[in-house]
Amino acid sequence: MKINDLTPETENQYFCCLEEWSEDMKDAGNGKQKWYEYMKDKGLRVKFAIDDNNAIGGMIQYVPAEHSMIEGKNLYVVLCIWVHGHKQGRGDFRKKGMGKALLKAAEEDSRNLGASGLVTWGLIIPVFMKASWFRRQGYKVVDRDGIMRLMWKPFNDAATAPKFIRPRRLPAKGKDKVDVTIFKNGWCPNFNIAYERTIRAAEEFPGKINLNEYDTKSRGVVEDWGITDSIFIDGKKINIGPAPTYEKIRKKIAKKVKKLS
């Protein structure tokens, strides 16, 4: 196995998170590519794990803290580590040490870039990005938000612990129309799928929807709202991990529209 950096030849695999086979991925639009074009000169780092057959099986992406969902100084933040585990497409690459190798490479790279530590998030439920896995790699919890844990590995005594950015205000319920508010960053295709489906669903109700879209690549938007990736329908946050189906989103909006009359 080897760890390679992103190249122009592997960009398309990166944009779809190694899931070229996925029908759902078609709903993601070009949000990830736009985010990449914006971030590629702002400290974004991407690495791939490649097996002995020269097949890409996993990836890691990490950014400076000031371009992430956390508050921190002189830190890099892992947005995600993803080792392809589906039978479809390229197949299952789990349990081969790719995740550990990717994380180690990111730590070494972050040190060389002068960062004081590497930060990540983890979930306390047994799914993607498990907090328990990061704990075994030497990461410690420094903040909590629901089922999410903010974890880090400081590299020196000068490192200051990070914390989650928390909402400073929330979208309000609509008055004469249903309010649909989207906070979109673009780094995650799963979130982008949810955003694109929500926009399509909102368009099904002309004259009934007040659609607001905020680009959270802008740090000013993040500092104003304290929100990075979310969808609100009439002031209520909906779950977008994993991305809900178009039908489910449309049903939520239709229910609110019905109450207008």
What are these regions (language model features)?
Residues 235-261:
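Non-catalytic, surface beta->alpha helical segment in thiol-disulfide oxidoreductase systems
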Residues 121-122, 138-152:
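Conserved catalytic-core motifs of GNAT/GCN5-like acyltransferases
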Residues 167-204:
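Local sequence-structure signature of Cys/Sec-based thiol-disulfide redox active-site neighborhoods
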Residues 108-124:
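Conserved GNAT acetyl-CoA-binding A-motif
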Residues 90-108:
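Conserved acetyl-CoA-binding loop-helix of GNAT-fold acetyltransferases
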